A protein has these predicted regions:
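Auxiliary alpha/beta "docking" domains used to position bulky ligands
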Residues: 1-187
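Active-site recognition of the HExxH zinc-binding catalytic motif
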Residues: 190
């Protein structure tokens, strides 16, 4: 496990505009695979709902070179969505700043990926604002200690749930896991 490289990746992610970064071995998502398989066995009618997630169950087979997952968070604040979008799913997906081709966020992300290339780190991922990417974002973020799940199954970081999550599979073995001290949802939480 290369701790120096893990620190370099973390520091570069912050320099590229991410709020935080964690790195976990690919095995850290075994729990997700087990839970998903159990879910599909227990509720067979949910197979269509989770069909887009099937590739998450075969990461090791699909990417035999991958050893670690780099997860980055980007806090987008207490943005208030227009009234016409209230009570609709995927608002963040549709209005993500990463969808603006010449935007600052896209340029920052590209500079992070260029750095991976400069360091001869093979990678895949970086998708955000897409229905499915290479890595299951919330489980990877929680495994990296960047946040927790609360009762509503949302990802919560230190500032709440308004985060964009970005992940990469990389071909280097390294780990950078945070100790999270985010309190669980209070009993009064719905």
């Amino acid at each position: 496990m290369n701790t120096l490289l893990a620190q370099e990746i973390h520091d570069k992610a912050l320099a590229c505009g991410y709020d935080d970064c964690g790195i976990v071995p690919l095995d850290a998502l075994d729990f997700y695979k087990e839970r998903m398989i159990k879910r599909l066995e227990d509720v067979p009618e949910s197979k269509k709902v989770y069909a887009h997630s099937n590739a998450f169950l075969t990461l090791k087979e699909n990417y035999p070179w991958a050893q670690s997952i780099v997860v980055c968070t980007e806090y987008f604040g207490a943005y208030k969505f227009p009234a016409s979008l209230q009570k609709r799913y995927a608002k963040g997906l549709l209005l993500s700043l990463a969808n603006i081709p010449d935007g600052v966020e896209v340029k920052q992300r590209r500079s992070f990926e260029t750095w991976f290339n400069d360091k001869n780190i093979q990678f895949i991922g970086g998708e955000t604002a897409k229905p499915t990417g290479v890595v299951p974002l919330r489980p990877a973020s929680v495994a990296a200690g960047l946040g927790i799940y609360r009762k509503n199954n949302f990802f919560y970081g230190p500032k709440g749930s308004n985060y964009e999550l970005v992940a990469y599979l990389i071909d280097k073995s390294c780990e950078y896991i945070h100790d999270t001290d985010i309190p669980p949802c209070p009993d009064s939480c719905n």
